[in-house]
């Protein structure tokens, strides 16, 4: 590193000592790494792997000695014998790159990670316990995918809606029209479309009874599957995410669940559906379904790279979205929990689960 760059950093950083910027092990893991990488123009240097601790901004093509990589997507670098952090996409193995300026996401928690490798590109409060609302349904669908893979059921398996599946679910949790009725027969694929596109809670319970014999048995399976995936701060008490103080998870656990679900091609297809038509049943006329994900249909939030997956909203959870996007051979998974619905100066409302997800997609697919 040149003397001029060292001097500039010394003046900017001042008296920050070697031990001031230490990683908080409870929040961030650090994998050892050794490399010399170059900054892109506008690379930001942080005291900790957290965008709130900005120290300075570097010009392009500054060589930095890397000593590690944090679990939330930062390089650990040495500057003036001190440890600092630079966002991963701000460094490159070659000169002449453009750094991606890191911006915080306006939500209680957010992340974006690689769906293939599991590497997090950006994370913000990713391990905080929060209400997931209907993003819970990804776990419900994952267990249905498991049952299909095990040969226990098939997409064309007919299912009769029981009165017990409908019992105890408030009317505002039914989102298909007309609502499912006891005695109505649909197949597994149609019920999955009701869950993923229209976020129907009754359909979740119908599938739960099919897979596990009862809703309670299915909920136990949900929690066991979450534990096996390494989910933390996670406890499911229903199949749909309907608000309950004992129903919670975190952004990273939703990332793990969604990453697992994406191993199933059928899940990928259903998650990417912008719309579907449910044929007439023995008790209802044809139903038309449309995704609740504004990134996947004509809207101000439309993103051509978006391929899924599930929205969620409740007063207790705020606005939530677990998303996925693909560009060339790269697929990323995004999670936004606790976003707002902000009133803008022109009287419109900014639905931040969508606007913030678009920021995450831009981060995750930069340079791909």
Regions inferred by a protein language model and the residue ranges of each:
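Bacterial N-terminal signal peptides that target proteins for export
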Residues: 1-5
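Solvent-exposed coil/turn segments that connect beta secondary-structure elements
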Residues: 42, 50, 69-71, 80-82, ...
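Active-site-adjacent loops and short helices of periplasmic peptidoglycan-processing enzymes
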Residues: 96-252, 262
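Penicillin-recognizing serine hydrolase domain
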Residues: 103-109, 213-368
């Amino acid at each position: 590193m040149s003397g001029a760059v060292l001097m500039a950093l010394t003046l900017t950083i001042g008296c920050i000592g070697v031990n001031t910027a230490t990683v908080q092990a409870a929040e961030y893991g650090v994998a050892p790494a050794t490399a010399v990488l170059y900054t892109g123009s506008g690379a930001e240097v942080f005291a900790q792997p957290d965008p709130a601790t900005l120290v300075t901004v570097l010009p392009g093509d500054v060589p930095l000695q890397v000593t590690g990589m944090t679990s939330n997507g930062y390089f650990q670098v040495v500057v003036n014998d001190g440890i600092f952090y630079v966002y991963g996409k701000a460094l490159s193995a070659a000169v002449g790159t453009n750094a991606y300026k890191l911006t915080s996401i306006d939500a209680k928690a957010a992340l974006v990670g690689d769906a293939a490798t599991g590497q997090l590109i950006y994370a913000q409060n990713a391990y905080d316990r929060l209400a997931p609302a209907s993003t819970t349904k990804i776990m419900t669908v994952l267990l249905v995918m498991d049952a299909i893979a095990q040969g226990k059921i098939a997409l064309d398996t007919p299912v009769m809606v029981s009165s017990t599946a409908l019992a105890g679910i408030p009317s505002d949790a039914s989102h298909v029209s007309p609502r499912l009725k006891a005695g109505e027969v649909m197949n597994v694929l149609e019920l999955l479309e009701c869950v993923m596109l229209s976020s129907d809670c009754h359909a979740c319970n119908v599938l739960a009874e099919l897979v596990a014999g009862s809703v309670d048995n299915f909920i136990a399976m949900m929690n066991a599957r979450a534990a096996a995936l390494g989910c933390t701060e996670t406890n499911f008490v229903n199949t749909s995410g309907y608000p309950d103080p004992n129903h919670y998870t975190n952004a990273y656990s939703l990332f793990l669940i969604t990453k697992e679900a994406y191993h199933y091609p059928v899940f990928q297809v259903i998650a990417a559906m912008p719309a579907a038509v449910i044929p007439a049943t023995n008790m209802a006329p044809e139903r038309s379904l449309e995704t609740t994900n504004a990134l996947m249909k004509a809207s101000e939030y439309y993103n051509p790279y978006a391929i899924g997956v599930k929205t969620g909203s409740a007063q207790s959870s705020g606005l939530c979205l677990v998303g996925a996007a693909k560009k060339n051979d790269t697929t990323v998974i995004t999670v936004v929990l606790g976003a707002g619905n902000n009133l803008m100066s022109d009287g419109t409302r900014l639905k931040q689960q969508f606007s913030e997800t678009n920021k995450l997609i831009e981060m995750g697919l930069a340079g791909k």
